[in-house]
Design a protein with these regions (language model features):
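Catalytic cores of DNA base-excision repair glycosylases
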Residues: 1-202
Length: 202
């Protein structure tokens, strides 16, 4: 999987605050759209202090490439205000405090722990949830169940890398529909391929 997906990319954002905001912007959009919106936003408002005072219409214009820009603009401004008021302008480093921020769920909070603080955490999105179940690593119904199950099944030293690898693999190979099983290096050991997908691809 590492050979196909590639090694984890180095997060280019300079601050923990920028990692948090970019992760919120990444919800329900493509990576390239997130990158464009983040670059435009941080050029004008690189800190929580500046973003908390920015006009909402200006934020909306800058993050428009990320989609759902009106909702996201309200969220990231509200987050910035709370960070300034409660956390000295920086994201908190605990899961519980991150979850207290507007628009921050478990996946977003765990991504911030991983990429901003380099803490072991298990971000689970649709790709991680799908691939984990297809490979038989877990048998779960929800991303939260998958998170807990993977934390038990995967060695802690691999947690930081797992999200990146599975997301990239889910985008390239293990697609939601018509997965490219014959291109997958794991297909000979994959229960999904052996039990059902194989019949569709041979």
């Amino acid at each position: 999987m590492r050979k196909t997906a590639g090694m984890p990319a180095v997060v280019s954002h300079k601050t923990k605050f920028q990692v948090l905001i970019s992760t919120v912007l990444s919800q329900r959009t493509r990576d390239e759209n997130t990158a464009t919106a983040s670059k435009q936003l941080f050029k004008s408002f690189p800190s929580a202090e500046l973003l908390s005072k920015a006009p909402l219409c200006k934020i909306e214009k800058l993050i428009r490439p990320a989609g759902f820009y009106r909702v996201k603009a309200k969220r990231i401004k509200a987050i910035s205000i709370l960070l300034v008021e409660r956390f000295g302008g920086q994201p908190p480093s605990s899961l519980e405090q991150l979850l207290s921020l507007p628009g921050v769920g478990r996946k977003t909070a765990n991504c911030v722990l991983v990429y901003a603080f380099k803490k072991p955490a298990m971000p689970v999105d649709v790709h991680v949830h799908r691939i984990s179940n297809r490979l038989g690593l877990v048998e779960t119904k929800t991303p939260e169940q998958t998170e807990q199950a993977l934390m038990l099944a995967v060695p802690k030293e691999n947690w930081l890398e797992l999200n990146h690898l599975m997301v990239r693999y889910g985008q390239k190979i293990c697609l939601p529909r018509n997965p490219r099983c014959l291109e997958c290096k794991l297909h000979s050991k994959c229960p999904c391929f052996l039990n059902s997908c194989r019949k569709k691809q041979v």
